[in-house]
Regions:
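N-terminal beta1-alpha1 cap of cysteine-dependent amidohydrolase-like domains
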Residues: 1-110, 120-128, 132-176, 182, ...
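Conserved G/P- and acidic residue-centered "switch" motifs that form tight phosphate/ATP-binding loops
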Residues: 113
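The feature captures the ABC ATPase H-loop/switch
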Residues: 116
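Active-site-proximal beta-strand elements of phosphoester/diester hydrolases
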Residues: 216-219
């Protein structure tokens, strides 16, 4: 059997401020191929080009990546202001219904940064436009200057629930992570379980309650140094295992239909 196919949800950019592209960080593809053991497939996040139904039938799982544009606040009942930054409505139109469909089908996904926020919004939650403006919260944004190593350096602790999903993945109730986000969870969706918190109370790790498939998602960026990092590697390994289990189940179902 071939490796599972993981659809990597892309972002839309203007290359050199004029050439439109669908792009995804190389670190995402490397983590999926080298740590999850799956085939990375970059997906154009535009409903004019591909449908959610087609993606569900073409892929065994999905990586909901980070990105500069934010989920539009209209998706959670709030009015857009400058504080919410830039948006990517085409990605919203793919990612949000994709999350809901995966939850119902038991198809695995792994949300990272914006992807983590998409999972919450898709399941009925809302977001703060700027975490650092809240009383008692730290600045979770990446440094404006410096090398990649400096931007992705370990910066804070995340405490996860004892006996919970992330404790089982990490084998520990405290881990150290990077942080490169401005927005964060305000209200958790009705089925969203906040399983990990930063020391300032910011939600950092979630999953969907009673979902039949893998839904673990994180606010930090585990794709950085994924093969060597003791926190990142088990996340991508667990996601790969879930994708293989889903692929195997689909293959068994197809054989039953054909027999």
């Amino acid at each position: 059997m071939t490796r599972p196919i993981i659809g990597i949800i892309s972002n839309s950019y203007l290359l050199n401020d004029q050439y439109p592209v669908h792009a995804g960080g190389a670190m995402n593809s490397e983590a999926i191929a080298q740590v999850s053991g799956c085939i990375p497939l970059l997906v154009p996040s535009d409903p004019a080009l591909v449908s959610v139904a087609e993606l569900l039938d073409s892929c065994d799982g999905f990586l909901l990546t980070g990105g500069r544009p934010n989920v539009h606040p209209e998706e959670y009942g709030e009015v857009a202001t400058e504080a919410y930054g830039d948006f990517d409505r085409a990605r919203d139109a793919i990612a949000l219904p994709l999350v809901r469909a995966c939850v119902e089908r038991g198809q695995p996904f792994f949300g990272v940064c914006r992807g983590f926020q998409e999972v919450n919004v898709a399941m009925g939650g809302s977001l703060y436009p700027e975490i650092r403006d809240l009383p008692g919260r730290m600045n979770h944004r990446m440094p404006p200057d410096g090398t990649m190593e400096e931007k992705f350096e370990i910066r804070h602790r995340v405490s996860v629930s004892e006996g919970g999903v992330f404790h089982k993945i990490f084998g520990a109730t405290e881990v150290m992570t990077n942080t490169l986000h401005g927005q964060g969870i305000k209200e958790a969706g009705p089925r969203i379980v906040i399983d990990g918190l930063a020391d300032d109370g910011t939600p950092e790790a979630i999953y969907v309650k009673d979902a039949p498939g893998f839904t673990a998602s994180v606010q930090w960026h585990p794709e950085w140094n994924a093969a060597a990092d003791l926190v990142s590697r088990p996340l991508f390994e667990a996601f790969g295992d879930a994708a293989r289990a889903y692929q195997s189940g689909q293959a068994r179902a197809a054989r039953r239909i054909a027999s």
